[in-house]
A protein has these predicted regions:
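Conserved small/polar residues in nucleotide/adenosyl-binding loops
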Residues: 1-5
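Hydrophobic, well-ordered secondary-structure segments
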Residues: 12, 16-23, 102, 122, ...
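Ligand-binding loop in jelly-roll beta-barrel domains
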Residues: 121, 125-135
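Catalytic core of non-heme Fe(II) oxygenases with the double-stranded beta-helix
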Residues: 46-115, 132, 142-154
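Short, cationic low-complexity segments
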Residues: 88, 156-163
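Conserved double-stranded beta-helix
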Residues: 11-74
Length: 163
């Protein structure tokens, strides 16, 4: 059964689009070049003692999490550290420093939005807590608005072909 798009969240996604444009501006990306496409979104309810294992969103350019209710447990963003000379070298450290870490923890609050590259591995930890964590998460794909004269960027779906 194909259903029409649920419009109850339209005001949220319009506000989120403005945040995505600000996010692109933070990196000095020409905002007028891209369409912001919300390709997936889902609600997540995480009960006490539950956690999400390390994963990434391979088909997404930008991923987001909007926290509706949170007991304060961290979201860990994980990246491969370019300073590491060989695999797992930084598992042998004696002290955490800015140049030898591979993770960044964010302790979100209710009504906070976190955006990050979809390829960035992330997870939550199994913290002792009394309350559920409830969030709305999703994936964004950026497509070129008008340009077809560049090797960079994803062409709009109107140029895609299926055979």
């Amino acid at each position: 059964c194909i259903r029409d798009r649920d419009m109850r969240l339209e005001p949220f996604f319009k506000a989120l689009k403005k945040c995505v444009v600000e996010y692109l501006d933070h990196f000095a990306i020409d905002k007028s070049t891209f369409e912001v496409n919300f390709v997936k979104s889902w609600f997540t309810i995480c009960d006490p003692g539950q956690h999400f294992p390390c994963h990434h969103h391979s088909c997404s350019h930008i991923s987001f999490v909007y926290y509706l209710q949170t007991p304060g447990d961290p979201l860990i963003l994980h990246r491969k550290n370019p300073n590491e000379w060989f695999g797992d070298a930084f598992k042998l450290i004696t002290e955490n420093r800015y140049n030898n870490g591979d993770g960044y923890a964010i302790t979100p609050k209710a009504e906070h939005l976190v955006m990050f590259p979809g390829h960035l591995e992330h997870y939550t930890t199994p913290e002792d807590r009394e309350h559920r964590r409830i969030s709305l998460a999703g994936d964004i794909v950026l497509t070129l608005k008008h340009r077809t004269d560049t090797e960079s960027g994803l062409l709009p779906p109107r140029y895609w072909k299926q055979f």
